[in-house]
Amino acid sequence: MMKEPTYSLHENHAMSIPVAQSGKTRIGWIGTGVMGRWMCQHAMSKGFTATVYNRSADKLQPLLDLGAKAATSPKGVAEQSDIVFAIVGFPSDVRHVFLGADGALAGSKPGTVLVDMTTSEPSLAKEIYEAAKAKGVASLDAPVSGGDVGAKNAALSIMIGGDKDVVAAVQPVFEAMGKTIIHQGGAGAGQHTKMVNQILISSNMIAVCEGLLYGYKAGLDLETVFKSVSVGAAGSKALEVLGPRMLARNFEPGFYVEHFIKDMGIALAEAEKMNLSLPGLGLAKQLYEAVRAQGYGRKGTHALLMALETLNGIKR
């Protein structure tokens, strides 16, 4: 019989982690909202049994209908799982679901793997890593990019920080939900990479919204304009995915404005620690704070268009 592949938990540690196997490895999932529901569903579709928890229990139902089991706390999830994933809203939520008295670490046995897929603070990722290591538990920070479309299509980009051997052990589950899976370095490196991603998006979103607004004001047919500019040098993922939604006046979230503001705040704080000036990011955050002030905090990031319309006295 072929021996099951394993990876050591940490250097100088005797414990090993089996590579995740369909039908054998039990996963836990904390946070089943716009992104998490689909990510967990894809893992289940590959044969991984799941125990799930969400603060709003009604959002669990699609996964329960597919055979997942519900837990009443993050701790309860970990008690029934070999690998625990979480994708929640804010760093305070991350701290609660992993390090709280009723958090996943409290329910983890030695050899469990904790995977935070929330966009959060690099320093918190390192804190979770150290707290987990002290209990013989592994930890990865693995934020994602691709929004709701990427989550639904199992096409996410997953940026991972943590020990290389642990990444290899979790790889089969990552492959169920993403297409681009890259280990960026030690604990916190995944979160730092996601900050790069969000900085790139921030100024690009301003450009997309301002470009379409200019076309509208010039009296152009925006559908026709889109066909030309989306395939040229100005083309971008933001324009490709969110441009049609803006043209259709569909501002429902693939990614919430309020979460994007959180991400930009983290990036600016990290930049300050590095004595790095990022004026474009600062401007983007101010504009998105105006979007939130106008009542669009729970809309998608492309709702920036509506705030710019208001700024220019345009009513549509």
Each model region followed by its residue ranges:
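Rossmann-fold NAD(P) dinucleotide-binding segment
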Residues: 74-86, 90-137
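NAD(P)-dependent dehydrogenase/reductase Rossmann-like domain
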Residues: 13-18, 289, 293-316
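NAD(P)+-binding Rossmann beta1-loop-alpha1 motif at the extreme N-terminus of oxidoreductases
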Residues: 3, 7-86, 112, 117-118, ...
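Rossmann-fold dinucleotide-binding core
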Residues: 119-202
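Active-site-proximal catalytic alpha-helix in oxidoreductases
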Residues: 154, 158-161, 175, 182, ...
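Hydrophobic beta-strand scaffold residues
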Residues: 50, 70, 139-140, 181, ...
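Interdomain hinge/lid region at the active-site interface
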Residues: 187, 191, 235-302
